[in-house]
A protein has these predicted regions:
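Conserved AMP-binding/adenylate-forming core of the ANL superfamily
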Residues: 10-64, 81-86, 137-143
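ANL superfamily adenylate-forming
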Residues: 16, 105-162
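Short acidic/polar active-site loop segments enriched in Thr and Asp
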Residues: 44, 95, 119
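Structured binding elements
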Residues: 70
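Conserved residues at the C-terminal ends of beta-strands
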Residues: 12-14, 95, 100, 124-125
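AMP-dependent adenylate-forming
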Residues: 1-23, 126-133
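Conserved ATP-dependent adenylate/AMP-binding module captured primarily in the ANL superfamily
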Residues: 78-113, 142-143, 147-148
Length: 162
């Protein structure tokens, strides 16, 4: 459908009081770039990716990108506690999580630390991690949807590996 609708608006959101639209073409590009990035960080078809986000355009792009990589989306509630996240990570065997905000990451990161399978955290917004262990790789959404050819810099400081 992206080819049919091109630059027509597909998704929209209000950020900082301003409306912002994402075209069909841009959404398709981000989906493909995310799928490529998930594969690049080591995910394989059939791997699970937990998605912790409120309704926003990135949620749909994440879901489609996960599926385009051949992986399985594990959607969760934004009201989950650390205990809930720990249970879902253990039960699903998710190898990565995508989380939208620092607020949601507060209950998620301790569960990721406890998980034996999950070692990738992708933050849609900036996620402050403090003293993150070497076993967890943190990635920023903007880098994941930029596509390999679009990356101008990779931030390799502690807690921002990706």
């Amino acid at each position: 459908r992206a080819a049919e609708n091109g630059d027509k608006p597909f998704l929209s959101a209000t950020r900082d009081g301003e409306g912002r639209a994402i075209s069909w073409n841009e959404a398709a590009r981000q989906v493909a770039a995310l799928a490529e990035s998930l594969t690049r960080i080591g995910l394989e078809p059939g791997d699970r990716v937990m998605l912790v986000s409120e309704n926003r355009p990135e949620w749909l792009i994440a879901d489609l990108g996960i599926m385009a990589a051949g992986c399985v989306t594990v959607p969760t509630y934004t009201t989950n506690t650390t205990r809930d996240h720990t249970h879902i990570l253990g039960n699903s065997g998710a190898k990565a999580v995508i989380v939208s905000t620092q607020k949601l990451a507060r209950n998620l990161i301790p569960a990721v630390l406890f998980s034996s399978e999950c070692n990738h955290v992708i933050g849609i917004e900036d996620i402050r991690t403090g003293q993150a262990p070497e076993t967890i790789n943190f990635h920023h959404w903007d880098e994941m949807v930029a596509g390999q050819a679009d990356v101008g810099a990779l931030d390799q400081r502690r807690g921002q590996r990706g």
